[in-house]
Amino acid sequence: MNTSVIRVVVVSGSLRAPSRTHGLLQALVEKLQARLSNLDVHWVRIAELCSALSGSLERDTASADLQLHLQAIEQADLLLVGSPVYRASYTGLFKHLFDLVDHQSLRGVPVVLAATGGSERHALMIDHQLRPLFAFFQAHTLPYGLYASVEAFDQHHLVEPAQFERIERVLDTVSAFFQIPVASAA
């Protein structure tokens, strides 16, 4: 088994904290950590960066804290990204964050796409909005996305068993990407 550290960057695109988007990503990270012990996990929470992002029209005007998050994204071995669905798309500050990321830095990086919304009708946002964004970066978007509607949560905690099954399927593709034997924690 590969024992080198895998730098995982988790981007939670919600403007609120706590949020269902964060809850979905947290469940994903916990299941990933149950499978692999060689992870270095870095969280980028848009809710904590609203002021820094709105005050940074260009990369060179970004605060030191925002620069650290941008560098973490650019150096990631694996990205886990999620956003709530607003008006059939991801949040504006989520997009603005990636506007500041070097356009060549994510080439070939595997990305797990996730979204949350009020109903199942928003599930296509993953394929119609998130996947094209990361295609621009020439990132490797993994085939299974994670979408969870409000019914999958108790407050901000993921509770729906079918969602945990989807997470395991996603993690199987992550394991295959890194050529790690699949040993499901389910």
Swiss-Prot record:
Induction summary: Transcriptionally activated by SfnR.
Classification via Pfam families: FMN_red
Keyword Flavoprotein among UniProt keywords: yes
Enzyme nomenclature, EC number: 1.5.1.42
UniProt keyword terms in alphabetical order: Flavoprotein, FMN, NAD, Oxidoreductase
NCBIfam families hit by this protein: FMN_reduc_MsuE
PANTHER family assigned: FMN REDUCTASE (NADPH) (PTHR43408:SF2)
Function in brief: Involved in the dimethyl sulfide degradation pathway. Catalyzes the NADH-dependent reduction of FMN.
Official protein name in the record: NADH-dependent FMN reductase SfnF
Annotated organism of origin: Pseudomonas putida (Arthrobacter siderocapsulatus)
